[in-house]
Structure formats: C-alpha cells, structure tokens
C-alpha cells in the first residue's frame, strides 16, 4: 500500500490491498495514474477531485473494509505463497481475511513460516 517494497528495490510486488500512489474514480473506476494533485502543505479539510467522466470523487486505489481484493494481485500472492522457500510475516495482526490465510497456504506447501511481530497472532502456531 505504501510502496516501501518498491523504494527498497523489490521488483515483483503484488499490491493485494492496493496502493496510495495510484488513483481511481470511486464510481466508474477510471484510472488516474500519477495525475491527481496532492497538496504539499498542511491541509485541515479538502474535497477530493471529481472524476471528469462521472463526477464522483477520485480516491486512492486501496481496498477499504468491505471491498473485495483485486483478483490478479490476490491470485499472484497465493501462487507466491505456494511456491516460496520461506514465508516472512512481519508487522501484522494476521486477522484481516483473506490475506491472513497466506502464511497458512505457505506452511501447507512446506515452507517454513517466520513471524516478526511484537505480539503473538492467530498464525503464530505455524511459525518455526
């Protein structure tokens, strides 16, 4: 979501929960890659820009609670979990589904699961 993997040099990243750096129309789903002006100074309240095609607000292309995950990134993430040599779980509560099932998919495929978190999660029992 925050593009930290790309900034670190990763090249095969699947944004299962979307990205804050790509924009879409909240209604017609028109893409607005890198075309939305974002204020560079502190803003206390601002109206989102309107889609010129349907008038609905333009929003970050992220998955909000209750929305479906994007199909292609999800499918690629499942394949990666099935084929990985080791699966790292870092900084998550491991309770938001369906993404929380990925460590279990990796474990069932024979990969060791390593969890790095300040507290135990529902998936801690899978960890080596």
Which residues does each predicted region cover?
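Conserved catalytic alpha/beta core of Sir2/sirtuin-type deacylases, generalized to analogous enzyme cores
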Residues: 1-127
